[in-house]
UniProtKB/Swiss-Prot annotation:
NCBIfam families tied to this protein: division/cell wall cluster transcriptional repressor MraZ
Entry's localization field: Cytoplasm, Nucleoid
SpoVT-AbrB domain ranges (all copies): 5-47, 76-119
Protein name per Swiss-Prot or TrEMBL: Transcriptional regulator MraZ
SUPFAM superfamilies attached to this UniProt entry: AbrB/MazE/MraZ-like
The protein's assembly and partners: Forms oligomers.
Name of one Pfam family that matches: MraZ
Cellular component annotations (GO), alphabetically ordered: cytoplasm; nucleoid
Recorded family membership: Belongs to the MraZ family.
GO molecular function: DNA-binding transcription factor activity; transcription cis-regulatory region binding
Chain segments annotated as coiled-coil in the UniProt record: none
Keywords from the UniProt entry: Cytoplasm, DNA-binding, Repeat, Transcription, Transcription regulation
Length: 143
C-alpha cells in the first residue's frame, strides 16, 4: 500500500527522487499521467492494468467518458526509475501540474500523486479539509 507524504526537489533535468518505499511498490517502471486537481497520478504497471480494465467498460457512446479517457490516456507515459532512484517527469506533465522546483509526493493506497508545492499547500488549506467535515463524510460512508 502506498502511504505517506514526502517533499522533494526537482533537478535541472526535471527529475525527482522517488521515496524508496514508493519505488518498492511501483517497481522499476510505472505509469505517470495527468491526475485530477492539477496533480499527477502514478500507478504500478499492475495497478494500471486493473484500472485499464475498469475504464474499458465505460460506454463509448458517452461524451463524458470519451473526454475523460482522452484526458487520462493521452497524458500517460511509462517512466523508468534510474539507479539513483530518480524519475524524469516529462515537460508536458510538469506544465500540467504546475511543477517547477519543489514537489510533494504522496501515497494514496494504490497510486502516488505528485503535486507542485504551491498546489499541495492550497489543497491542504482547502475548506473541505476541516476535521469536522471529514469526520462527517466518514460517518456518511460508514467508515
Amino acid at each position: 500500500m502506498l502511504i505517506g507524504e514526502y517533499k522533494h526537489v526537482v533537478d535541472s533535468k526535471g527529475r525527482i527522487i522517488l521515496p524508496s518505499k514508493f519505488r518498492e511498490e511501483l517497481g522499476e517502471r510505472f505509469i505517470l499521467t495527468k491526475g485530477l486537481d492539477n496533480c499527477l497520478f502514478g500507478y504500478s504497471l499492475k495497478e494500471w492494468g486493473v484500472l485499464e480494465e475498469k475504464l474499458k467498460k465505460l460506454p463509448l457512446t458517452s461524451k463524458e467518458a470519451r473526454t475523460f479517457l482522452r484526458f487520462f490516456f493521452a497524458g500517460a507515459c511509462e517512466c523508468e526509475v534510474d539507479k539513483q532512484g530518480r524519475v524524469l517527469i516529462p515537460q508536458n506533465l510538469r506544465e500540467y501540474a504546475g511543477i517547477q522546483k519543489e514537489v510533494f509526493i504522496i501515497g494514496v493506497m494504490t497510486r502516488i500523486e505528485i503535486w507542485s508545492e504551491n498546489n499541495w499547500l492550497k489543497e491542504m488549506t482547502n475548506e473541505n479539509l476541516s476535521v469536522d467535515r471529514i469526520a462527517q463524510k466518514m460517518e456518511e460512508l460508514g467508515i
